[in-house]
Design a protein with these regions (language model features):
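Carbohydrate-binding surface patches
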Residues: 418-461
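C-terminal beta-strand-rich structural cap/linker in extracellular carbohydrate-active enzymes
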Residues: 481-506
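N-terminal module-boundary/linker segments of secreted carbohydrate-active enzymes
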Residues: 31, 35-81
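Noncatalytic carbohydrate-binding groove/subsite architecture in carbohydrate-active enzymes
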Residues: 170, 209-339, 346
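Aromatic/acidic polysaccharide-binding cleft in carbohydrate-active enzymes
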Residues: 314-401, 414-419
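Substrate-binding cleft and catalytic face of glycoside hydrolase catalytic domains
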Residues: 65, 88-257, 272
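Conserved, mostly hydrophobic/aromatic
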Residues: 60, 195, 267, 343, ...
Length: 506
């Protein structure tokens, strides 16, 4: 209960920045690979013909750090530019649910079928477009979308309507959702592919307190139908509940209704509570980082995977926070790299999100108090210290970069099996671009030579790569040659407790 209370307090505070039944399991463990090898060489088999999910990308909740409907910008222009370059050029996030403030702080009018645009925070959206969206798009972020979730925190005026007239309440929710998509199109010139519809609506934050899976489903249907009548193809990211199991239950209720299902673009989930096997960085390092992933956590993710397969809907991991380690440390980087590997492997997650894309020291002090260190935001991708004009890519940011810098939208995750449970390998093929990529995590205390055989393709030349270990981040590697005769195998030395990314053409 303490963890959930802390979650609600923290996320409610962060929500005010934006606006102006899981239990940790310590039971059985499961292994997904062989025991740690006693020799120095690790063998990895990759089957390029055995495809899993299509990758969508990497992202984060995106706070513009512009408040009061655009009047209060926390970041000096040069510092903002550096921060955005770190997020979108260097780490290479492409996705993000973007805060739009309260958006509709008071009901626009009494008719949910008539939109009074004067009541919307369009000025704030214009400022966000000028200072965040347009620069981010220029740097490659082509998957940003409205994050004005349906929440009684953001729209308290909905409460009496909900209590007195449920049908009108659904229409008001639909108007709220559709207005954001329409104005996003008008201001940015782009129709968003997605809309983040809910965030911990029933559990954790409980942003729709007193709601039910039926109400969630009704909102999806009403808002989706109104979007289509407005000519908008935007689909919804649903669930994003407190834990994988709770997210699966909520998503199952929505997807079982064919009228609602047609509007769903992805199933979102969170990995909480904070002590869970994949939220806590220490638990990650002690569990899957030692070759012992938690069996219940794996089962929950496989249930999400199976649900997505059943309805042909992608699965996204849409938030993680409270890792608990210094964001400057290699342990923090390696822990989140392990989590990404496992979310992709067990849930077939097509997207992985950090907590926030950017966060700054002024906002941190104003909303959490001066005693709270900016470094406590360890799962935000880039931290900005305004007093020293410094921009820090966190361990979580570097971990995401080890994947995002090498894996583009449309790539396929393919089957990879390591004969050492301390050496984890994710493999991807991208037929459109003729590239294959690999992320290798060595959790052992010693360096390893990793020999990778790829069946089903032949490389046209050597691979290139980068490596993180100790205090070094994304260090460029020399050319990694492939076998001359067949071009389907390569070997690379990976230091102890390191993360390595490699890519080559085929």
């Amino acid at each position: 209960m303490m963890a959930r209370s802390r979650q609600a307090v923290r996320n409610r505070a962060v929500w005010f920045v934006l606006a102006g039944a899981y239990s940790a399991t310590a039971g059985a463990q499961t292994r997904t690979a062989q025991a740690p090898s006693t020799g120095a060489e690790v063998r990895v088999q990759v089957n390029a013909a055995s495809a899993h999910q299509v990758m969508e990308g990497f992202g984060a909740t995106t706070v513009p750090l512009i408040y009061q409907n655009g009047a209060d910008d926390k970041l000096p222009p040069a510092l903002r530019t550096r921060a955005l370059e770190a997020v979108y050029r260097d780490v290479r996030l492409t996705l993000g649910n973007v805060s739009m403030g309260q958006w509709e702080p008071q009901n626009d009018d009494a008719d949910p079928m008539h939109l009074n645009e004067a009541a919307l925070e369009v000025a704030g959206l214009r400022a966000t477009n000028d200072k965040l969206l347009a620069p981010a798009r220029a740097l490659g972020a082509d998957g940003l979308y409205p994050g004005n979730v349906v929440s009684l925190w953001a729209t308290e005026w909905l409460k009496p309507i909900r209590a007195s007239d449920y049908n009108r309440y659904l229409d008001e929710c639909a108007e709220y959702v559709v207005s954001a998509v329409l104005k996003w199109r008008d201001v940015t010139g782009e129709i968003p592919r997605y809309q983040h519809l809910f965030n911990e609506a029933l559990y954790g934050n409980v942003e729709l307190r007193g709601s039910s899976p039926k109400e969630i489903t009704d909102i999806v249907k009403r808002a989706g139908a109104r979007l289509r009548s407005a000519g908008m193809p935007t689909t919804f990211i649903i669930a994003s509940e407190y834990s994988p199991a709770l997210s699966a239950a909520e998503a199952r209720a929505v997807l079982s209704d064919p009228d609602a299902r047609q509007y769903v673009g992805a199933i979102g989930y969170h990995p909480y509570p904070y002590e869970s096997p994949y939220a806590s960085m220490e638990n990650i390092l002690a569990g899957p980082g030692m070759g012992r992933p938690d069996a219940n956590a794996v089962a929950d993710r496989r249930a999400l995977r199976d649900l997505g397969r059943q309805y042909n809907v992608p699965v996204w991991m849409t938030e993680v926070s409270h890792g608990g380690l210094d964001p400057r440390s290699m342990d923090a980087l390696r822990a989140r790299a392990i989590e990404i590997h496992d979310e992709l492997a067990y849930a077939d997650a097509s997207a992985f999100f950090a907590m926030h894309a950017i966060w700054d020291s002024k906002s941190n002090t104003e909303h959490f108090g001066a005693a709270r260190s900016l470094l406590k935001e360890e799962d935000t991708v880039v931290l900005i210290e305004i007093g020293t004009s410094s921009v820090l890519i966190t361990g979580t940011g570097y971990a995401i970069g080890h994947y995002a810098r090498w894996v583009q939208r449309g790539a396929l995750r393919v089957e990879s099996v390591s004969d050492d449970s301390l050496v984890m390998v994710s493999a991807f093929t991208d037929k459109k671009r003729g590239k294959a990529s690999f992320v290798i995590i060595n959790n052992a205390d010693t360096a390893k030579t990793v020999r990778v055989h790829v069946s089903g393709l032949a490389f046209t030349g050597p691979l290139e790569g980068e490596q993180s270990e100790g205090d070094v981040r994304w260090k460029a590697l020399g050319a990694v040659p492939t076998t001359e005769a067949t071009g389907d195998e390569f070997a690379v030395t990976v230091p102890a407790k390191s993360v390595t990314s490699l890519g080559g053409t085929f």
